[in-house]
UniProtKB/Swiss-Prot annotation:
Subcellular location: Cytoplasm
Positions contributing to substrate binding: R96, R106, R134, D224
Gene field: leuB
Protein name per Swiss-Prot or TrEMBL: 3-isopropylmalate dehydrogenase
Pfam family of the protein (one): Iso_dh
Top-level taxonomy: Bacteria, Pseudomonadati, Pseudomonadota, Gammaproteobacteria, Lysobacterales
Organism annotation: Xanthomonas oryzae pv. oryzae (strain KACC10331 / KXO85)
GO biological process: L-leucine biosynthetic process
Length: 357
């Protein structure tokens, strides 16, 4: 079996956190005899600086050839003024769409050692373990037509389009039901079917797919209510499935229930479990180069990669246990530090996880 992984450190803190994730990957590779081949390239702003494009053609070909892609983060203020079509984020959108990565998995898991880090009361979030499944290659971020125009009265207007086809909804719905079957057998589909035509089709197709999953309890919720319920009573959810834009917003909201977005990994999968794995957080240019970024989300993304693309559950479990051990030792990066714990930097945190394996 081919086991090639494309490493894309990206921008901002990306190279720093990726270095620690690769250390962990290499240790687990040695321990379990997995035989991975690591290939390196650039994406985002770093790719624009090197190639003149946020995603070079040769990088895309390397991504197609690899079995999995591990990404740091993209973006930064130094690229804010370039042509919008060349912005770092466009490279991220393009690689997702070109690889057919339609299912984005964003877990929100509260580590008991970090219960005090959440802004919500401990009794509201203790034991939180939910998964948001976001459709990633359709909807308003890719819909056409989109653009800017000047109206007859001289006023500027901008417009976007939110299309979803039956097949796009069907495949993400099936993925949602399958994930729910592996977890708590509850699926909540989030839409805005009281207003949007695309959401009305979304709800209808999800209902049709549900007939093949009689063992899963399906519910529907409008996105505004879902945002409120995530704060009011987040433990009511097991798996949430939703469209691209709603999932983008709700998954960031859910991440803060856990106290730090620096703890949360994500996976973006195609129909055959090939995936791109990355932390939920951004490139954090304000702390780039300071050696204080939290690498745990990227390290946990490695665990997701081992679990979902390479079917190495034992190796994935080992990484997740090692992260738990490090937290038990009281080691914290600045974003999750609290009184009575030991503040460490990026490299020290990565070394601690390697030592705990």
């Amino acid at each position: 079996m081919s086991k090639q992984i494309l490493i894309l450190p990206g921008d901002g803190i990306g190279p720093e956190i990726m270095a620690e994730a690769v250390k962990v990957l290499q240790r687990i590779d040695t321990q379990h005899g997995l035989g991975f081949e690591l290939v390196y390239d650039e994406l985002g702003g770093a790719a624009y600086d090197k190639y003149g494009s946020p995603l070079a053609d040769e990088t895309l070909e390397r991504a197609r050839a690899a079995d999995a892609v591990l990404l740091g983060a993209v973006g930064g203020p130094q690229w804010d003024t370039i042509d919008p079509s060349l912005r770092p984020e466009r490279g991220l959108l393009k690689i997702r769409s070109q690889l057919g990565l339609f299912a984005n998995l964003r877990p929100a898991l509260l580590y008991p050692q970090l219960a005090d880090a959440s802004t919500l009361k401990p009794e509201v979030v203790a034991g939180l373990d939910l998964l948001i499944l976001r459709e990633l290659t359709g909807g308003i971020y890719f819909g056409q037509p989109r653009g800017n125009r000047t109206l007859d009265n001289g006023e500027r207007q901008a417009y976007d389009t939110l299309p979803y086809s039956e097949s796009e909804i069907c495949r993400i719905a099936k993925a949602g039901f399958e994930m729910a079957r592996l977890r708590g057998k509850k699926l909540c589909s989030v839409d805005k079917a009281n207003v949007l035509a695309s959401s009305q089709l979304w709800r209808a197709v999800v209902e049709e797919v549900a007939k093949d999953y009689p063992d899963i309890a399906l519910s529907h919720m409008y996105v505004d209510n879902a945002a409120m319920q995530l704060v009011r009573a987040p433990k009511q959810f097991d798996v949430i499935v939703t469209d691209n834009m709603f999932g983008d917003i709700l998954s960031d909201q859910a991440s803060m229930l856990t106290g730090s977005i620096g703890m949360l990994p994500s996976a973006s999968l195609d129909a055959n479990s090939k995936g791109m794995y990355e932390p939920c957080h951004g490139s954090a240019p304000d702390i780039a180069g300071k050696g204080i970024a939290n690498p745990l989300a990227t390290i946990l993304s490695v665990a997701m990669m081992l679990r979902y693309t390479f079917a190495q559950a034992d190796a994935a479990d080992a990484i997740e246990r090692a992260v738990g051990k490090v937290l038990d030792q009281g080691l914290r990066t600045a974003d999750i530090w609290s009184e009575g714990t030991t503040k460490v930097g990026t490299v020290a945190m990565g070394d601690a996880v390697v030592a705990a394996l």
